[in-house]
Amino acid sequence: MREPSAKDVDKIEILEKCFDYLCDYGLEQVSIRKLCDRTGMGAGSIYYWFKNKDEVILDATEYGINSLIDELMDFAFEHIDNISLLCEEFPKMIEQRIDKLKVIIRVATSPMYCDSLNLYSKTFTYKYDSYARKLSQRINLPYNTIRVLVDNFVSVTIDCIICEDWGKYKRQLEYVLEALKLATIKKEKEESESQNTFTWFTTGTDL
């Protein structure tokens, strides 16, 4: 069977296979030969896409981060109005993906790769900003308020990935989401009071 040409192969497909390989075997077991076996490509094709093994690890990790962020944040965004469901289901989603998330943490904290991975930080910041702005428009809260809550959401999730304290994580999620709910209620109350004041001024009241 003919080896697929590098130009005929979608790089996203390659990155997905490389990331799955990292999750299955760990950083120490990465080799071009094993990557060839996993992707079904020859060494020449691998080097067409990547300069070396380290670039494979970094690019595959970036792919993994992006895909997992999208999966998790899309779910959170879809169910943001249902706090009890989010607090119940989101930890399950994290637990189902814990091995992949731990690989990302390992690469991000590795002395060999952390500086290089920081080059991708603008991409991740953009993603968090994008979700914060979408959520701001959906629930009519200021972007700055939402952005802080998104950062807290991400922070407690990373803490859970490292420690795997699911009870603590659920409590922290409830706290962050309740803060979001209270901010929404406060905003609605302020808007209602403002509307009532405007109505009083426009209609007038006999003294």
Which residues are covered by each model-predicted region?
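N-terminal intrinsically disordered/low-complexity leader segments
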Residues: 1-9, 192-207
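Recognition helices and adjacent regulatory flanks at domain boundaries
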Residues: 7, 19, 33-35, 50, ...
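Helix-turn-helix
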Residues: 13, 17, 21-55, 59
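Hydrophobic alpha-helical connector segments
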Residues: 59, 72-98, 149-150
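Short, basic, alpha-helical segments at the C-terminal edge of helix-turn-helix-like DNA-binding modules
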Residues: 62-69
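Amphipathic alpha-helical packing segments from all-alpha helical-bundle domains
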Residues: 74, 99, 113-148, 174-178
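Helix-loop "lid/cap" segments that line or gate small-molecule binding pockets
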Residues: 88-96, 103-114, 136, 180
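Amphipathic C-terminal alpha-helical segment
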Residues: 96, 106, 140, 144-171, ...
